[in-house]
A protein has these predicted regions:
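C-terminal structural segments of small proteins and small subunits
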Residues: 65-89
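Short basic/hydrophobic patches in alpha-helices and adjacent helix-turn junctions
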Residues: 53-57, 70-73
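Acidic, glycine/proline-rich low-complexity segments that act as flexible tails and inter-domain linkers
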Residues: 1-31, 39-41, 45-56, 80-108
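Winged helix-turn-helix DNA-binding recognition segment
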Residues: 59-63
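An amphipathic alpha-helical micro-motif enriched in hydrophobic residues
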Residues: 30-40, 65-74
């Protein structure tokens, strides 16, 4: 666990453990988790915390779009649009962090 991001690292660890102790496939689990994040209007950090597990489960951008389409009639268009923005902000943050880490390694 990184000492720089202990809360985020703990959430990622919890997510990984919950996948390992679940009876559905990791892919189905992450699809359900994505739907839940959208339904509760989760902030970008929640999507960021779940991104490693979603990637390991093999979720694609088409999967994310499919979940958004499937739940839009239930949770409403505003929630789905907000989720899209939150996901984009989370991805932008992840890219910025990755770029900073690469620059730091290059300076070392």
């Amino acid at each position: 666990m990184s000492t720089d991001t202990p809360v985020l690292d703990t959430i990622v660890d919890i997510t990984t453990a919950s996948i390992e102790h679940n009876s559905v496939s990791p892919r189905d689990f992450m699809l359900a988790r994505l739907a839940a994040l959208i339904a509760v209007d989760a902030p970008p950090a929640s999507y960021l915390a779940n991104a490693p597990a979603a990637q390991q489960a093999g979720l694609t951008s088409q999967d994310v779009e499919g979940v958004m389409i499937a739940i839009a009639p239930v949770v409403g268009t505003p929630r789905v649009v907000a989720a899209a923005g939150h996901i984009l902000r989370a991805l932008g943050f992840a890219i910025a962090v990755g770029d900073a880490e690469m620059a730091e390694e290059a300076d070392s």
